[in-house]
A protein has these predicted regions:
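A ubiquitous, low-specificity "background" feature that marks scattered single residues
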Residues: 8-9, 138
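Sec-dependent signal peptide recognition
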Residues: 2-8
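C-terminal motif of bacterial Sec signal peptides marking the signal peptidase cleavage site
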Residues: 13-16
Length: 224
């Protein structure tokens, strides 16, 4: 009888030890966390970060690097989370309303990314601008369009046209840019811009878009 009890105890201990040896460590949680963080960098955020010359890393928390805001038509500024901020930038060019202007601030710097939009000869045109919010200098610009004519209005995407705006300091009380086309000043302003040959309408609309769009951010610059 005693032997049976002893054998039973040994068997129970053996089975218990074997069960514990089969327990696998939970390796899934860190993977889930990393995946969740990676999802924050969607395609729109990637585009904005690259335009702002921000290098992406696998462990980067975007919220530590940039912050999004929105300015309404009255100049009221509201903070947005990453998803809402990226969505506003993505939808802004195709939206007919200019009431809510997107802002992306680069943390621990004076840099800010803004967007302006207008109408070209063939359809919507828009631009992203990387600026120094303190000096009001344009650091980088990228024009885009939906249906401008190749060889003419589509030339707004050429570096030779875009580079005219880089390094210019904007005015927040009147027109920054003037348009000069075929020796004639079509739009009055502080900084002359050479229009694209054969694309006077598109050139005019780009300059109007920048002048009016940047003036629309005047209250943002005033509170910086």
């Amino acid at each position: 009888m005693k032997k049976i009890i002893i054998y039973s105890i040994i068997l129970i201990l053996f089975l218990n030890c074997r069960d514990k040896s089969n327990v696998q460590p939970n390796l899934e949680e860190p993977v889930v966390a990393a995946s969740s963080n990676a999802q924050k960098i969607n395609s729109t955020l990637q585009e904005l970060l690259r335009f702002a010359d921000i290098s992406e890393t696998n462990d980067m928390d975007v919220a530590d690097v940039v912050g999004f805001k929105m300015m309404d038509v009255r100049g009221n500024i509201t903070s947005l989370d990453l998803e809402d901020g990226a969505t506003l930038f993505k939808s802004y060019p195709s939206s007919e309303s200019k009431q809510n202007r997107p802002i992306m601030e680069i943390n621990d710097s004076n840099k800010v990314l803004l967007m302006v939009k207008g109408k070209g000869f063939g359809g919507p045109i828009w631009a992203k601008l990387l600026m120094d919010a303190t000096t009001h200098e344009i650091l980088k610009v990228k024009f885009e369009h939906k249906a401008e004519t190749e060889g003419y209005g589509a030339g707004i995407t050429r570096a030779s046209f875009q580079n005219q705006f880089i390094g210019k300091t904007i005015k927040i009380s009147n027109n920054t840019f003037a348009l000069v086309q075929n020796g004639k000043e079509w739009i009055k302003g502080e900084q002359p811009i050479d229009g694209i040959s054969g694309a006077t309408v598109t050139s005019e609309n780009v300059v109007h878009m920048l002048n009016e769009g940047l003036l629309g951010y005047a209250q943002y610059f005033q509170v910086r």
